[in-house]
């Protein structure tokens, strides 16, 4: 009975020798690596979710009390975390506000930059921009960020400067480039919009202010209002351009 057992043991050793220690060790190392990566991904997802919860709580707290009065203790309570957890992600209240701007508004800036860079006719681009604004800003909590900047910016110039640098300066640069091209193609009768691209964003600001103050008295159809604004704006520009073209025709 001992001999068969001895032969089986030798056969097992031979099989291991044939496979080689590197291959069996490699399998174990591979499994360990997958488990470690999975755990790391889970930790990263949990950290990202906690960070997002803090940002959402900060938006609620800043909106309810203003930047000066809002306390990080209350932000932590809203987010369901300890106050010390906030400092794992943000240095102080100002950096939390700045990251709120960056997280909420910068992705929309990117979408608008892409729309403005298509080279399509200006009115088509503007229609796309209206849809982005209505869907991604006015229809979401992002409009609360803009309300905060309107109310808090004058009292906290550093926050206004940050918003201008991260959001407005990029939008104005993209708008001016698109408007210059449209003017060169004859789509605009003058360079007024190139000089004052803020005119394109004006109805969005009006919509946000109106919705916060007067919407319960007279609800505003934001999309229709913005289109009416652009009809008026480009209608005037088109009339100016047509007048210029007619004058040029008579001169020849």
Feature-to-residue mapping (PLM):
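N-terminal intrinsically disordered/low-complexity leader segments
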Residues: 1-49, 60, 241-252
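Hydrophobic/aromatic-rich alpha-helical bundle segments in the mid-to-C-terminal region
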Residues: 3, 161, 183-231, 240-252
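Amphipathic, non-transmembrane alpha-helical scaffold segments
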Residues: 47, 55, 101, 160-172
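Helix-turn-helix
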Residues: 53, 57, 61-95, 99-100
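Residues in soluble alpha-helical coiled-coils and helical-bundle/repeat scaffolds
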Residues: 63, 77, 91-95, 99, ...
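Hydrophobic alpha-helical connector segments
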Residues: 99, 113-143, 193-200, 223
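Short, basic, alpha-helical segments at the C-terminal edge of helix-turn-helix-like DNA-binding modules
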Residues: 102-107
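Amphipathic alpha-helical segments used for helix-helix packing
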Residues: 137-165, 208-213
């Amino acid at each position: 009975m001992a001999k068969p057992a001895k032969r089986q043991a030798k056969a097992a050793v031979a099989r291991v020798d044939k496979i080689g220690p590197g291959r069996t060790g490699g399998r174990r190392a591979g499994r360990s690596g997958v488990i470690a990566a999975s755990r790391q991904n889970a930790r990263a997802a949990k950290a990202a979710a906690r960070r997002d919860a803090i940002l959402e709580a900060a938006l609620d707290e800043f909106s309810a009390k203003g930047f000066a009065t809002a306390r990080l203790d209350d932000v932590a309570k809203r987010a369901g975390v300890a106050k010390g957890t906030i400092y794992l992600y943000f240095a102080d209240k100002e950096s939390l506000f700045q990251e709120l701007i960056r997280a909420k508004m910068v992705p929309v800036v990117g979408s608008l930059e892409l729309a403005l860079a298509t080279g399509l006719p200006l009115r088509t681009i503007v229609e796309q921009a209206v849809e982005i604004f209505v869907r991604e800003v006015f229809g979401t909590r992002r409009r609360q960020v803009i309300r905060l900047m309107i109310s808090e910016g004058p009292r906290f110039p550093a926050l206004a400067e940050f918003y201008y640098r991260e959001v407005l300066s990029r939008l104005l640069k993209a708008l001016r480039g698109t408007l210059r091209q449209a003017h060169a193609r004859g789509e605009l009768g003058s360079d007024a919009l190139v000089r004052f691209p803020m005119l394109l964003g004006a109805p969005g600001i009006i919509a946000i202010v109106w919705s916060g103050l007067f919407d319960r008295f007279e609800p505003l159809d934001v999309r229709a209002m913005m289109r009416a604004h652009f009809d008026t704006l480009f209608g005037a520009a088109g009339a100016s351009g047509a007048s210029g073209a007619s004058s040029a025709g008579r001169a020849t």
